[in-house]
């Protein structure tokens, strides 16, 4: 049976067709780089929204295999940190990291290194990724390692991106609380659940934590990098993760470069770390992942 698009998503689609919000709409909640990225993302996806009907958006091919559980991949039974290894060619904060790298080859390195899950950047303008990267990675692992889960790492603003993530083989999507209204979060989270995808709620402060919990988030990541100014501070995880309910899977994101960093956030209660730049640059991802789990 095909999952149906939630009614609020239909309403949001119609609103989005009529008026793509400009950066100024969200300036009160964001500033600088994040505002720029979100404004661009809304413009970027507008043609994709106009090109599909509500029925197209609601239809997720029932023949697609059910994706493996992202949440389950982050719950290790040995007390060690789960590691979400990210494929990221560049970023606004670091600049070029490994521009020419093959997403599938890097994914194979991560799998061999013992990564618990993968995060694949699909934003092209700012991070050098694409949906084709995600498709290639999930296709490569569908038979070789079907339990390996992938997060579609992008700036999600509309259900069409969730339909794309499902079609491309993702197991989870990212919801950046700071960048979205509560109505938008509700639409995205509802549609992700209908599509069988987990949602990683990303927060940066107590107010965003409360909003994520209000929406029923089961996986919450503390981004140690302030996306408005791109400054990193691991003390954010140390301050916020102890405030998570016990049932919530806690992820610490960004600014984790070695075992000492990983130990800090694990001591605060993190179940998993999401690491991109350090693993992309590591001569041996296996050695670095082992260091994270010491």
Predicted segments, located by residue:
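Active-site mouth loops of central-metabolism enzymes
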Residues: 87-102, 148-157, 200-202, 252
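Alpha/beta enzyme core
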Residues: 99-118, 144, 162-172, 188-198, ...
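Alpha-helix-loop-beta-strand connector modules within alpha/beta enzyme cores
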Residues: 128-151, 186-201, 234-250, 292-294
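Catalytic cores of alpha/beta
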Residues: 157-168, 206-215, 256-275
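Hydrophobic faces of well-ordered beta-strands that scaffold small-molecule active sites
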Residues: 83-85, 118-120, 150-153, 173-175, ...
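Glycine-rich phosphate-binding active-site loops on the catalytic face of alpha/beta enzymes
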Residues: 164-183, 222-229, 270-288
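An N-cap/entry alpha-helix motif that binds or orients negatively charged groups
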Residues: 29-100
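Short, low-complexity, charge-dense intrinsically disordered segments
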Residues: 1-27
């Amino acid at each position: 049976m095909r999952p149906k698009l939630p009614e609020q998503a239909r309403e949001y689609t119609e609103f989005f067709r009529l008026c793509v919000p400009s950066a100024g709409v969200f300036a009160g909640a964001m500033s600088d780089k994040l505002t720029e990225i979100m404004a661009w993302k809304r413009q970027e996806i507008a043609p994709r929204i106009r090109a599909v009907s509500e029925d197209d958006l609601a239809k997720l091919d029932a023949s697609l295999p059910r994706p493996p559980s992202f949440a389950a991949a982050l719950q290790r039974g040995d007390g060690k940190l789960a590691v979400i290894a990210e494929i990221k060619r560049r970023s606004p904060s670091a600049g070029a990291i490994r521009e020419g790298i093959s997403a599938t080859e890097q994914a194979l390195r991560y799998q061999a290194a013992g990564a618990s899950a993968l995060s694949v950047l699909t934003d092209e303008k700012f991070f050098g990724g694409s949906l084709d990267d995600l498709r290639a990675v999930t296709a490569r692992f569908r038979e070789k390692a079907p339990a390996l889960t992938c997060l579609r790492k992008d700036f999600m603003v509309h259900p069409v991106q969730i339909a794309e993530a499902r079609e491309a083989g993702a197991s989870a999507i990212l919801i950046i609380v700071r960048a979205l209204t509560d109505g938008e979060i509700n639409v995205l989270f509802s549609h992700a659940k209908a599509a069988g995808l987990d949602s990683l709620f990303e927060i940066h402060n107590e107010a965003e934590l409360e909003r994520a919990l209000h929406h029923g988030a089961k996986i919450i990541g503390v981004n140690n990098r302030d996306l408005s100014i791109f400054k990193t501070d691991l003390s954010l995880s140390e301050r916020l993760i102890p405030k998570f309910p016990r049932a919530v899977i806690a992820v610490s994101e960004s600014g984790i470069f070695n075992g000492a960093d990983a130990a800090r956030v694990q001591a605060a209660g993190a179940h998993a770390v999401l690491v991109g730049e350090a693993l992309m640059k590591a001569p041996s991802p296996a050695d670095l992942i082992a260091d994270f789990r010491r």
